[in-house]
Regions:
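A short, Lys/Arg-rich alpha-helix, primarily the initiator
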Residues: 1-12, 50
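Hydrophobic alpha-helical segments, especially transmembrane helices
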Residues: 11, 29, 45-47
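Short alpha-helical DNA-recognition segment
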Residues: 14-33
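DNA major-groove recognition helix of helix-turn-helix/homeodomain DNA-binding modules
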Residues: 43-62
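Short, charged recognition helix plus adjacent turn
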Residues: 57-76
Length: 76
């Protein structure tokens, strides 16, 4: 997982930096540093993102909605 991957996950969730950082239990600055590549993505951070974001019904619903929009755009 890279900082860019984390930024994409945050975008899928339609969350701003402060909200996402709070959800995964890190500071806004740390999240920004990770997303921009200034700090590495640790295994501990990956686990926090998985447990608090990816492995949730909310994330799956957002992802499903985006997939449906993409499919509709391709069919148009």
């Amino acid at each position: 997982m890279t900082g860019d991957d984390i930024a994409k996950i945050r975008a899928i969730m339609e969350m701003r930096n402060p909200e996402f950082a709070e959800r995964i239990g890190i500071s806004r600055q740390h999240l920004s540093d990770v997303e921009t590549g200034k700090k590495p993505v640790s295994l501990k951070l990956q686990a926090k993102i998985f447990m608090n974001v990816i492995d949730t019904p909310e994330y799956r619903n957002h992802l499903r909605r985006l997939q449906n929009l993409t499919l509709q755009a391709k069919l148009s």
